[in-house]
């Protein structure tokens, strides 16, 4: 019996394979003991006493959604093999000198096997900058994965890569089609738990985003899914303390790009005092002050993206706005919106004129010529990182490198102040 090629580089539990397949696979104990504690070998979580089963074994609750791992069982994997050498890059665009410098740095990182952090402002053109290094590894017969914590980011990346690369591309997330083996994979970071020493190059985009940031299980997945001699590259527009520390310790090389691809500065957020938003919302009405800002913006006819702190408030705001602005086509999206992707596309195509969103759209999506309002910008869910990302939706396109970016608040907090300061610093660093 021959090994199913789709199994190469993948990690399996006992119940996912037939008896014959298990005999062909390499084996790992499902759990390991260290300093008197038990750890799951798939997700590296510490096994708790209450996860004990009546049959006399422990199970891991942390990665249970990926099929149960039990201490009395084995994990199985099939070593990855090289792909045929090929020429995969179809993209013939031109990088700016700033992008070119980062692209060159990444090619050198592969040659020197140096883990690298790319800290590039929102709208710098990070995707194009990784093309050369992705192509280099695939052309040599290697396997590459682009991973992100956010499904929306994965879908955007997948669309872009399909246009610009000639090889097959597998897209993996919670509701995607089954995996098929291909030299280029786009996956949510959770999906990396299903791989073992599979990739020559793993690029993790949006490393500052939930659910990846401060998640030891996903850090382990990133480490485990790369070959022993493979390379990890991290992309971010807002670095984290953890990454900055690794740069200081020399564990990561940092490549900076403080300038957007079109050469114009990042838009500086404008804080606007708004103390009566919730008072009016509770009465199912719109704050007159907020209404006047929306009316003024709608006269421009540019699309308007409004960020709300919570799903319930966002839904309510969408209903009120539709009453107040009957000529506008208004949508609302959150992590639980079933037709989110369709609404996002409708907004991009101009079929929706106002879109209200939770932080789900704070990153990885581009809407040409958009203006952005954040209501309750001082809400605890709007961190410095998320406010910088939200701000990065404005002024991304060459057609309109400017735009309105308004932070409505009822008290300036540290997150708003730090976000504004960091955006100003990035512009200064870019010489703008």
Swiss-Prot record:
GO terms for molecular function: 3'-5' DNA helicase activity; ATP binding; hydrolase activity; nucleic acid binding. A motif (DEAD box) lies at residues 205-208. Its EC number is 3.6.4.-. The keyword Transmembrane helix does not apply. Disruption phenotype: Over 1000-fold decrease in transformation efficiency. PROSITE patterns: HELICASE_ATP_BIND_1, HELICASE_CTER. It comes from the Bacteria. One of its GO terms (biological process) is DNA replication initiation. Its cofactor is Zn(2+). Its main location: cytoplasm. It is an enzyme of class 3 (hydrolase). The keyword Ligase does not apply. PANTHER family: COMF OPERON PROTEIN 1, PRIMOSOMAL PROTEIN N. Monomer and dimer in solution. Interacts with DprA and ComFC; ComFA-ComFC form rings about 150 Angstroms in diameter with apparent 6-fold symmetry. Involved in transformation (genetic competence for DNA uptake). DNA uptake is energy dependent, this protein may provide the driving force for DNA uptake. Does not have helicase activity, translocates on single-stranded (ss)DNA in a 5'-3' direction in an ATP-dependent manner, but does not unwind double-stranded (ds)DNA (tested with 5'- and 3'-overhang dsDNA). ATP hydrolysis causes the release of ssDNA from ComFA. A ssDNA-stimulated ATPase; dsDNA does not stimulate ATPase. ATP hydrolysis causes the release of ssDNA from ComFA. ComFC has no effect on ATPase activity. This is Competence protein ComFA. It comes from Streptococcus pneumoniae (strain ATCC BAA-255 / R6). The gene is comFA.
């Amino acid at each position: 019996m021959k090994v199913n090629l789709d199994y190469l580089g993948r990690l399996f539990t006992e119940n996912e394979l037939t008896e014959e397949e298990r005999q062909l696979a390499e084996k790992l104990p499902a759990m390991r003991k260290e300093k008197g504690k038990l750890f799951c070998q798939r997700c590296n979580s510490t096994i708790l006493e209450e996860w004990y089963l009546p049959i006399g074994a422990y199970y891991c609750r942390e990665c249970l959604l990926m099929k149960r791992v039990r201490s009395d069982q084995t994990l199985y994997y099939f070593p990855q093999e090289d792909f045929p050498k090929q020429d995969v890059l179809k993209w013939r665009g031109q990088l700016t000198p700033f992008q070119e410098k980062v692209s060159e740095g990444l090619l050198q990182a592969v040659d020197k096997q140096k883990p690298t952090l790319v800290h590039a402002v929102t709208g710098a053109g990070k995707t194009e900058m990784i093309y050369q290094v992705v192509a280099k590894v695939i052309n040599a017969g290697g396997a590459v994965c682009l991973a992100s914590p956010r499904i929306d980011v994965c879908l955007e990346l997948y669309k872009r890569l399909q246009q610009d690369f000639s090889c097959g591309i597998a897209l993996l997330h919670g509701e995607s089609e089954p995996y098929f083996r291909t030299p280029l994979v786009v996956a949510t970071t959770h999906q990396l738990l299903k791989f073992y020493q599979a990739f020559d190059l793993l690029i993790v985009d949006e490393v500052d985003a939930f659910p990846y940031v401060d998640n030891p299980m996903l850090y382990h997945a990133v480490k485990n899914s790369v070959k022993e001699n493979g390379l990890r590259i991290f992309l971010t527009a807002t670095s984290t303390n953890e990454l900055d520390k690794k740069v200081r310790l020399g564990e990561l090389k940092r490549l900076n790009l403080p300038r957007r691809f079109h050469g114009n500065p990042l838009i500086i957020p404008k804080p606007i005092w708004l103390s009566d938003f919730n008072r009016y919302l509770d009465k199912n009405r719109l704050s007159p002050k907020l209404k006047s800002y929306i009316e003024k913006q709608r006269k421009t006819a540019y699309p308007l993206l409004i960020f709300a702190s919570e799903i319930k408030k966002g839904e309510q705001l969408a209903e009120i706005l539709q009453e107040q602005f009957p000529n506008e086509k208004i949508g609302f999206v959150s992590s639980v919106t079933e037709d989110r992707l369709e609404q996002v596309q409708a907004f991009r195509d101009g079929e929706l004129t106002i879109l209200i969103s939770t932080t789900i759209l704070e990153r990885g999506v581009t809407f040409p010529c958009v203006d952005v309002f954040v209501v309750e910008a001082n809400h605890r869910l709007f961190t410095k990182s998320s406010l910088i990302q939200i701000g990065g939706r404005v002024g991304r396109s060459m057609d309109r490198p400017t735009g309105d970016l308004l932070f409505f608040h009822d008290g300036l907090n540290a997150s708003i102040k730090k976000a504004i300061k960091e955006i100003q610093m990035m512009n200064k660093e870019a010489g703008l």
